[in-house]
């Protein structure tokens, strides 16, 4: 499989909108900003910890991942490694992150036929947003924050609920001339959701063996109970298959919790797997 470098430059392709939060009876804190060339939006029930402390923890995670693993920063450890023969200076944190990326891609490869293996340091950015979501989620649990919503550039982790109200999110209509929510839904359990698409940045994902993505393929969202990075990898791998029938068959045959939006008969259509529907029940 041959893919251009832009395969990895996953900007915000597909919005997952936050539509609702915990009950208004409980104060929900919102922290937002920019990171990794995109936005982040984090909401959580007010905890025993000072909000500034939590905000600092989040920023430290972003700084650490950027300084360690960004393939776009010339002074990052990964960039230094690529330009240097002195592997002794390659810190353990980079090795650990690389090993995690390889594990994620190997797992996705077993699910999606033809999925590219992230087996080189240039692939760090492939699941960086999903990985950062998972790290922040883990940190929140360490801080005993149980109800939260984390969204980094469309890669999302949702946990908890309050007073019988679930977190609500919506998927944006993938057609650029049709603004609005395509499909809203409630999240009734702890879930990660990631989406891949080409409509905001045409051609940035190249199909297997360098082929072009069918213009009828609009977007794919994947859910996973544990890992946002894994959902991120699966969504990208499925989208890169490039053909409507091939994507549908992979989702169906492998039991992937996915929502596939595509053009058919001159109108937008969607395919929801049985596993996707079950996770939303």
Residue ranges of each PLM-predicted region?
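Mature catalytic core of soluble alpha/beta enzymes
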Residues: 2-14, 21-281
